[in-house]
Amino acid sequence: MELCVYTDSVQNLSRTDALDVIAKAGATAVELAVGGQSSAPHMNLSELLSNEKARDTLIGELNDRGLRIGALNCSAWPMHPIKGNEHVEIIKGAMKLAQLLDVKKIVTMSGCPGDGPNSSTINWIFFPWPSDGVDLLNRQWVQTLDLWTELAAFGNDHGIEKIAFELHPMHLVYNTPTLLKIRKHIGPIIGANVDPSHLFWQHMDPIAMVHALGDAVHHVHLKDLEFNQQQLGIAGTLDSRTFANPAERSWNFRTVGKGHGDEFWTPFFNALKGIGYDDVLSIENEDPYDTFEQGTIDAASYALTVLSKIPKQGVSRDI
């Protein structure tokens, strides 16, 4: 396995400074944000698609630091009633760019439709009641399977071998059953981006999920989570309070190692090794208490320390 950093982890820095921090942290790969939910602060998708010199410049900057592209990230809302069409084009653009850069994997999200033709936002159904909600969910699955059958074929035509869905709440594909459902319908090009942070707050077991998914694990995000027990006790995990006030929330994203320690991360990495996963472990830093740079560096340091204790793991240029 190989340490990678998602470039939005250092979104406040210029591309030059961001790549310097990533290399300094000990990573050997980057997951490049190309648009969708991200503003893509380090690259311009249209320019890279149309300008070979711009692509060569990017590759040169990576090579100079001993970095490679582990994946392109186009996490998006492809069925959003307002911005869905735009995001579908971003996903297709990411697939085209991946082919030009000889990258075989994109990281994205399934999306979630609204509740009808006049919707203004998504409608995520997570509870099997009332019955009209279940009927809506069934219609949403038809729409989702149609869209991703088309997008998977488009990706295959452009050399994409893996489409990694982040198992993320507010999207139709968010857990093991939903991932396996869409993978069964479309095929093995579809797999999971396993991010433990989103699983923790829903009380899923990331290690059990790794074993259940097996070779359907296409990508891994390293992000931690910490519960605020006082707030959890009175508000529960379904907490709609803003991330701008972390002290008032039931849970918050944390730098790897600051929410869970070796008791989780060691068996998690061993589980990945056990299913034969030999790809990037990509840091995604969203810690409200750390700066972008410090959170990324601390996450890398912790992850490399844990990985160094796991036998026969090639995890960085230094180990």
Where do the language-model regions lie?
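Acidic/histidine-rich catalytic cores of soluble enzymes
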Residues: 2, 29-30, 72, 134-258, ...
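Active-site acidic/histidine proton-transfer and metal-coordination neighborhood
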Residues: 16-17, 21, 56-57, 61-64, ...
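Catalytic domains of carbohydrate-active enzymes, especially glycoside hydrolases
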Residues: 16-38, 102
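A structural motif
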Residues: 27, 98, 103, 160, ...
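Short beta-strand segments at enzyme active-site cores
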Residues: 31-32, 69-74, 104-111, 162-166, ...
